[in-house]
C-alpha cells in the first residue's frame, strides 16, 4: 500500500511539473524606460525576473530593476513588481490576457509634492496575435499613480508590434505606442513611442536597440518626484541585452 501511495505521489508530481513551466530572465539596459520615462536618470540598469506559468493558463511572476533613488526619493534604488493573471486562446492565434500588476519601491518616501507614495496597483486586459501584435489596457486601482495622488482610474493603453525581417534570420522590427491618461490631472496626459530592432542570439540571448520619444512636458515627469533639471523624458537611443532561462 505504501509503495502504491508513493507511486501515486511521484506520478502526481510528474504531471504537475509537466503542466507548468518555470522561466527566468536577466538583463542589462543602457537606460530603464517605463512608459517613455527614464527610471534611472538616463543611466544603465540591471534587471531580472522569474515567471511560473501553468498549463491551465494561470501565471504568476516577479520582475525587478535598479532605479534612481533620486527619482524614487530616498528609496533602496529598487523596483520590485509582482503580477498574476490568466491567459487563454479564445480563437485560433488570438489570446486574451487578464490580470493584476503591482509596482513596489522599497523604502521610497512619500513625495512632498503630492503626499502619495510611489507604489502603484493596476488591473489589465490584453489581446494578442502570437507574438506579433498586442493591444493592452491597464487601469490604476489605488489612489496613487507613481507618486501622483488622487489618481485612481488612471489608464494606460498600448499597442505593440513585432515583425521578423525576412532577409535576416533572427532579426525583428519592434514598435510600441502608449497613451497615459492621468485621472483628475489631464495636463499630465502624454503619449510615448518607441521603435527599433531585436536580434536573437544563441543560448536564449536577445540584443535590442530602440529609439524612445514622447509628447510629455517637464511638469508631467517632475510632479511625482523631486528631480529637477533632469530630462527624464528626453528622446534617447536605448541598448539592451536579455538572457532567458528555461
Each predicted region: which residue ranges?
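Cleavable N-terminal export/targeting peptides
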Residues: 1-21, 246
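Structural signature of outer-membrane beta-barrel channels/translocons
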Residues: 13, 51-57, 87-89, 126-132, ...
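Short glycine/proline- and aromatic-enriched beta-strand/turn motifs that initiate or cap beta-hairpins
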Residues: 20-70, 236, 242, 246
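Repeated loop/turn-to-beta-strand initiation elements of outer-membrane beta-barrel proteins
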Residues: 22-24, 56-60, 92-98, 131-137, ...
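Transmembrane beta-strands of outer-membrane beta-barrel pores
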Residues: 28-34, 54, 64-68, 88, ...
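Residues that define the transmembrane beta-barrel architecture of outer-membrane proteins
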Residues: 42-46, 76-80, 117-121, 151-157, ...
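Surface-exposed loop and membrane-interface regions of Gram-negative outer-membrane beta-barrel proteins
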Residues: 58-117
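Outer-membrane beta-barrel "beta-signal"
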Residues: 163, 195, 199-205, 211, ...
Amino acid at each position: 500500500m505504501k509503495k502504491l501511495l508513493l507511486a501515486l505521489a511521484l506520478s502526481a508530481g510528474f504531471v504537475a511539473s509537466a503542466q507548468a513551466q518555470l522561466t527566468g530572465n536577466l538583463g542589462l539596459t543602457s537606460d530603464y524606460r517605463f512608459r517613455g520615462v527614464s527610471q534611472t536618470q538616463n543611466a544603465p540598469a540591471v534587471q531580472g525576473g522569474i515567471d511560473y506559468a501553468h498549463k491551465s493558463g494561470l501565471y504568476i511572476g516577479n520582475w525587478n530593476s535598479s532605479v534612481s533613488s533620486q527619482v524614487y526619493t530616498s528609496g533602496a534604488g529598487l523596483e520590485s513588481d509582482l503580477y498574476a493573471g490568466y491567459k487563454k486562446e479564445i480563437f485560433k492565434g488570438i489570446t486574451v490576457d487578464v490580470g493584476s500588476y503591482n509596482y513596489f519601491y522599497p523604502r521610497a518616501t512619500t513625495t512632498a509634492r503630492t503626499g502619495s507614495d510611489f507604489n502603484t496597483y493596476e488591473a489589465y486586459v490584453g489581446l494578442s496575435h502570437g507574438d506579433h501584435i498586442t493591444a493592452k489596457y491597464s487601469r490604476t486601482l489605488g489612489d496613487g499613480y507613481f507618486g501622483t495622488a488622487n489618481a485612481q482610474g488612471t489608464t494606460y493603453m498600448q499597442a505593440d508590434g513585432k515583425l521578423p525581417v525576412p532577409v535576416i534570420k533572427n532579426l525583428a522590427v519592434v514598435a510600441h505606442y502608449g497613451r497615459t491618461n492621468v485621472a483628475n490631472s489631464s495636463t499630465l496626459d502624454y503619449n510615448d513611442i518607441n521603435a527599433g530592432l531585436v536580434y536573437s542570439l544563441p543560448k536564449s540571448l536577445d540584443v535590442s536597440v530602440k529609439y524612445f520619444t514622447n509628447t510629455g512636458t517637464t511638469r508631467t515627469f517632475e510632479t511625482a518626484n523631486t528631480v529637477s533639471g533632469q530630462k527624464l523624458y528626453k528622446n534617447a537611443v536605448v541598448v539592451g541585452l536579455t538572457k532567458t532561462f528555461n
